[in-house]
């Protein structure tokens, strides 16, 4: 089953045959030119979606003279789409708390709240919608599949479980793959619940 829709919709019951090398054979083996075309089409979809659903991006892009209809190549994306800086995101969150006006789903659809690691001073929180959470799970499951992990395997997730998204992505990917998950993050050895 190849899933190309936008916004993404995932069949979370889907699993390739256990002996399959690829999660999505067509997508993972396409020739470079075809892959670049597929990436460009997805970038067009994503930028149109952000333009229509996130005032932050529309405003930033209008200020830079960019419109999603101007994307004709991957080079256009690199040359025309302005860079978003951490300060831009923090300013947006100050103007429109708690997540800013760059989130592309309504507040009622936010499924998880995570954040950056805080390397620039303080973590920046962000909301993740259900469809995005499913996309994260499927991306991690696909990566694990390519490493030879299969349903029923035990996956040891040795990472810090905090606001930072990385460990949660690995955990949800292993769960999506129907693995037994063993989350084990940093911290003291004393029980946290009495």
Where are these regions (language model features)?
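Nucleotide 5′-phosphate-binding alpha/beta core
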Residues: 1-115, 121-138, 145-146
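Conserved adenylate-forming
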Residues: 2, 45, 52, 64, ...
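Positions that flank functional sites
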Residues: 76, 159, 188-190
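Catalytic micro-motifs at enzyme active sites that drive phosphoryl/nucleotidyl and oxygen chemistry
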Residues: 103, 160, 192
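Short glycine-enriched loops at secondary-structure junctions
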Residues: 110, 133, 160-163, 187
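Short acidic, glycine/Ser/Thr-rich loop/turn "cap" segments at secondary-structure junctions
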Residues: 120-128, 152-159
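Conserved ATP-dependent adenylate/AMP-binding module captured primarily in the ANL superfamily
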Residues: 137-154, 189-194
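Conserved AMP-binding loop of ANL adenylate-forming enzymes
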Residues: 145-173, 177, 181
């Amino acid at each position: 089953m190849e899933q190309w829709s936008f916004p993404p919709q995932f069949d979370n019951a889907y699993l390739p045959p256990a002996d399959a090398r690829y999660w999505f054979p067509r997508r993972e083996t396409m020739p470079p030119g075809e892959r670049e075309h597929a990436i460009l089409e997805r970038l067009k979809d994503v930028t149109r979606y952000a333009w229509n659903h996130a005032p932050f991006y529309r405003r930033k892009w209008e200020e830079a003279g960019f419109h999603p209809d101007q994307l004709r190549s991957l080079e256009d994306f690199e040359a025309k789409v302005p860079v978003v800086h951490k300060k831009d995101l923090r300013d947006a969150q100050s103007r429109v708390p708690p997540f800013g006006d760059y989130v592309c789903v309504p507040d009622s659809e936010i499924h998880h709240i995570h954040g950056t690691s805080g390397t620039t001073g303080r973590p920046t929180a962000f909301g993740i919608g259900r469809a995005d959470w499913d996309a994260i799970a499927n991306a991690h499951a696909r990566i694990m599949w390519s490493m030879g992990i299969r349903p029923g395997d035990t996956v040891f997730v040795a990472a810090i479980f905090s606001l930072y998204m990385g460990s949660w992505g690995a955990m949800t990917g292993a769960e999506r793959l129907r693995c037994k998950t063993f989350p084990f993050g940093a911290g003291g050895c004393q029980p946290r619940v009495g």
